Amino acid sequence: IHGKLAEMAGNYGVFGEAKRGKNLADLQKDLENGFVCIASVTPYFRFGQQKPDGSFYGKGGHLVPVYGCETEGGKAAYFLLHHPSMYAEYNVPHWAVTAEEFAPSFSGNYIRFRKAGTLRQAAAADALVMSRIYAESWKVAFRGNVPDGFLDGLSENHWVTFFEKTLTEGSLSAKLIFDKERAVGAVAYGAARTELPAGGTLVGKGGDYSAFGEVASLYLLPEYYDKGYGRELLESVRDELLGTYEGVYLWVLRENMRARAFYEKLGFVPTEDACLCDIDGKTLTDIRYVYHK
């Protein structure tokens, strides 16, 4: 079944997150959050399952991509888009059905996906957009670790000068990811930098990372956490850097367990290297994570 799901995901331009749901309430919640879900329905599902000769398609359950949408009257509905192979063979169109209509044929199992966000290279003109994303993310991601006074005083243009300079001179590259027309995440990356984050001090074995690429920073608007956008950003720059460098590294705050789990899930491993830096009189520790080819 995973092979079939992968095939369908490719056809619809989405990627899977390997999250399984077990009931209609979970499915509805994921649809409301913008995911595409591939659900298993019974062979007697009455919307689009009947062949021209009157018989039903398939001998067992059928996998159906499910999108969230609304009817003209504003009532929540499921938008069903069948596998492309069915178009040619059975001339099956699309249907929008209500939860009540969908529920009797829903097997109770689905896997959620998300439409791929739009990525583009960032330029110096995007400095304010990037800075705004970073500032909003910092205020949520680092609350409780970075001093409140620093976070509360963080303005949306805090990083504008930095990004204007680095993106103009080419010392860093950057990418933005969009949800429709809205920039919701950004990543800065490039060759390994000689300086440490925030002018910090290295503790640990160190080592020669001059042949590595570096993900200098990656942040999302808080409402876009855990929706696949960060993964798409990271995988894009990681793969780009691996085309030139022996590996990729990044620094992550020791106490930021959400971020650490995210990087570990995508193949980065922690090292014994730490960077000690000071923000408003508080010493913070970043851990170096490395991804090898």
Predicted regions and their residues:
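Short, solvent-exposed loop/turn segments that connect beta-strands within catalytic domains
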Residues: T71-A77, K180-R182, D280-K282
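Conserved glycine-rich acetyl-CoA-binding loop
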Residues: S217-E235, R254-A261, K265-L266
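Active-site-adjacent substructure of cysteine-protease-like catalytic cores
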Residues: R20-L81
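Noncatalytic regulatory segments and standalone regulatory/sensor domains
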Residues: Y57-G58, Y67-G117
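Short, high-confidence coil segments that cap the C-terminus of an alpha-helix
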Residues: G34-F35, L172, Y245
